[in-house]
Regions:
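Mature extracytoplasmic/periplasmic domains
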Residues: 361-481
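Conserved C-terminal helix/tail region of periplasmic/extracytoplasmic solute-binding proteins
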Residues: 436-555
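C-terminal motif of bacterial Sec signal peptides marking the signal peptidase cleavage site
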Residues: 19-22
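Short beta-strand->loop
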Residues: 106-117, 126, 164-165, 327-355, ...
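Early extracytoplasmic/lumenal segment of secretory-pathway proteins
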Residues: 25-101, 113-122
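Ligand-binding pocket segment of bilobal, Venus flytrap-like solute-binding proteins
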Residues: 220, 227-346
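Hinge/lid segment of periplasmic solute-binding proteins
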Residues: 69-72, 96-169, 193, 198
């Protein structure tokens, strides 16, 4: 209750700040910028940006930083015209929705520097568009291509990549506890890769129960889009869509078998038939669930309260790194005699089908002309290599900036080395007290050892690179390819149908384990009340006895 109150107050404060910005009168030599972003989704950037801005413009800048908790919160404020924002960071489908409503300024960031910004008014401006991994833009063009928008000039078709700049990206997968999977006898390559998305449904991939021990130990995301995507993939790989065709008459894939769709097409199909199938599976899944969560699932997995959770790769990486146990011995790894230590959590990316998502920076049409240059400078600043390294180290997600450029940049190496305690002859690693650490005291004995973990990691279970999903292991056993990762679009006219389905699923009964939890809580409350009544009754009797005794003494 207290947490909800604090969250509500935070949202109210953010709402007030969005209205209040621009009310203060600033000195003539100070510019202003209003940034709207997810909470905890950037490093402590402000001093670096102010210096960067001053070097380019010769002017100071005041930054107002406001956060949102969901894309829907952000969309509501922008679509209703309830906010004053200069630059913001929505997810892919929200960018599409804003663009279709004519609410985004064209950027042309991937053209020339002169097309993007007035370079003549800046001192030594370096355009950082080439720092972005080109495969990212290719994927966006492949999925979204041209978007039809309606603005003040009427209806026209535009390229989505001209209206945003990628920021962070990742995958959707399954976070799991290795220790308990090992106890249940299901921690091995064959078992997990047969189950795939079935891990979330306690299905071994053949329609059988994966393990009795998983019942009541599975978390599902309280997120319409992510849960829908995972369920669609499960339906596809489990054969439940065999022989069925797309029923949406407005879809270009109408009448086409689901099994012949690309992952991009599959993940964006929302016809009545598929929605009903998802609803049936999700309702049945509740028999296996511990519950639904958004932010706290990773803690329950580390503690062993739950064993499985639908997770975003950035959260998963953070959770995995938090799960290190010096005494744990991972049966999938090789150890020298007497050695131990490993991560008790793992992140599994199903190999047949999956979702790759991204967030990007946009400038809404509400951005005043006098703030436009500052907004564009801010976006370019975020694509500085050292900024990218700081962001990845701070928040755990993968930057759209090229991994190779970050890897080979001396400044980035030193930033990552300090953050991850990597020994190197070109820098000194210090602890919190400023003491220089020896090679033995560092977590990584060399940059090469760290780079193998950070940039080149290959999961021993699913052959995937968690941090960089564009990097595909050539000889991976299960034939994983990047085209098996689809990007979700806005559901458009079908959004209400999916939302209604999800609300129906969430409100249909409660999970058996949640019922047990509430029953236990109710019993605890009843026992507590009875104990309190008995204690008060006993206290009253003691009071009467004491009072009577005292009265007798005064007689």
């Amino acid at each position: 209750m207290k947490k909800n109150t604090v969250a509500l107050l935070a949202l109210m404060l953010a709402f007030v700040m969005l209205f209040a910005v621009g009310c203060d009168t600033l000195p003539e030599d100070v510019d202003e910028l209003v940034v709207y972003n997810w909470a905890d989704y950037i490093y402590d950037y402000e001093d670096d940006f102010k210096e960067y801005y001053k070097n380019l413009t010769g002017r100071d800048i005041k930054v107002t930083y406001v956060t949102f908790d969901t894309n829907e919160t952000m969309l509501t404020k922008i679509l209703n015209g309830d906010s004053i924002v200069d630059v913001m960071c929505p997810s892919e489908y929200a960018i599409q929705k804003l663009l279709e409503n004519g609410l985004l300024r064209e950027l042309n960031y991937f053209g020339t520097a002169e097309e993007y910004i007035d370079t003549n008014s800046l001192n030594g401006y370096v355009h950082n568009s080439e720092n972005i991994d080109s495969r990212f833009i290719e994927k966006i063009d492949e999925v979204f291509g041209s978007v039809q928008i309606t603005d003040g000039d009427g209806t026209k078709t535009v390229r989505m990549a001209d209206y945003f700049v990628p920021y962070m990206y990742g995958t959707l997968g399954v976070l799991y506890n290795k220790v308990y999977f090992e106890e249940l006898g299901i921690y091995d390559r064959e078992t997990l890769n047969n189950a795939n998305w079935g891990l979330l449904f306690n299905d071994d991939g053949n329609g059988n129960l994966l393990s009795d021990g998983l019942t009541g130990r599975i978390y599902m995301k309280d997120s319409i889009r992510d849960s829908y995507a995972a369920t669609v993939f499960y339906l596809l790989e489990s054969g439940k869509l065999d022989g069925l065709t797309v029923q949406d008459t407005s879809s270009p894939n109408y009448g086409k078998p689901y099994t012949e769709l690309t992952m991009g097409q599959m993940i964006n199909t929302v016809d009545d038939q598929l929605i009903d199938l998802c609803a049936d599976v999700l309702k049945k899944q509740k028999e296996q669930l511990y519950g639904y969560e958004v932010d706290f699932g990773k803690n329950e997995l580390i503690q062993g309260i739950a064993y499985v959770d639908l997770a975003w790769s950035g959260d998963a990486l953070y959770a995995v790194e938090e799960s290190w146990d010096d005494d744990y011995i991972d049966p999938m790894l090789e150890y020298e005699e007497g050695e131990s230590g490993g991560y008790t959590l793992g992140y599994y990316v199903p190999h047949d089908s999956g979702n790759i998502w991204f967030d990007g920076w946009v400038i809404p049409t509400t951005c005043p002309d006098e703030h436009l240059q500052a907004a564009k400078i801010f976006i370019n600043f975020l694509n500085e290599l050292y900024v990218s390294a700081n962001n990845m180290m701070e928040i755990g997600y993968t930057s759209a900036v090229s991994a190779e450029k970050v890897r080979n940049d001396p400044e980035c190496r030193e930033i990552l080395a300090q953050g991850y305690l990597v020994y190197g002859e070109d820098w000194e690693i210090t602890d919190e007290d400023g003491n220089v650490l020896s090679q033995e005291d560092c977590d990584y004995a060399s940059w090469e050892e760290f780079a193998e973990y950070f940039f080149d990691y290959v999961d021993p279970i699913d052959d995937s690179n968690w941090r960089y999903p564009f990097e595909i292991v050539p000889d991976n056993e299960y034939g994983r390819e990047i085209n098996q990762l689809g990007v979700m679009k806005d559901f458009g006219a079908n959004n209400n149908k999916v939302s209604t389905m999800w609300e129906d699923v969430r409100s249909t009964g409660i999970t058996a384990w949640a019922l047990l939890g509430w029953t236990a809580l109710a019993l605890a409350v009843v026992v507590g009340v009875i104990a309190l009544v008995l204690w008060l009754k006993r206290r009253k009797m003691m009071y009467v006895v004491v009072k009577k005794s005292s009265t007798e003494q005064h007689k």
